[in-house]
């Protein structure tokens, strides 16, 4: 995977691909790929974070996130390129793949 900061047009293309089938879209906020997930309860939110953390550790690409009861707020950025890269979109896609399990 090419590690580079995505250009404005690349961001729009990747964001459109990521969001094409999602009821609640990801957004670009403060130069980060962002989304808030809402679950039925804290246990589901924490289980989602655990699955996501295991994948993030495997890829050595860690999210900025926080949890408040049943909500998980996520911001993805690649510090090595000072912006959003394909690694952020890969992690976002993987996180979305965990959602049907909840």
Curated annotation (Swiss-Prot):
Taxonomy, superkingdom:
Bacteria
- Give the E.C. number(s): 4.2.1.96
Keyword Lyase attached: yes
Pfam families attached to this UniProt entry: Pterin_4a (PF01329)
By its UniProt entry, which Gene3D superfamilies does this protein fall under?
A: Transcriptional coactivator/pterin dehydratase
Q: Which GO terms describe its molecular function?
A: 4-alpha-hydroxytetrahydrobiopterin dehydratase activity
- Reaction(s) catalysed by this chain's protein: (4aS,6R)-4a-hydroxy-L-erythro-5,6,7,8-tetrahydrobiopterin = (6R)-L-erythro-6,7-dihydrobiopterin + H2O
Instruction: State the family named in the UniProt similarity comment for this chain.
Output: Belongs to the pterin-4-alpha-carbinolamine dehydratase family.
Protein's recorded name: Putative pterin-4-alpha-carbinolamine dehydratase
The upper taxonomy is: Bacteria, Pseudomonadati, Pseudomonadota, Gammaproteobacteria, Alteromonadales
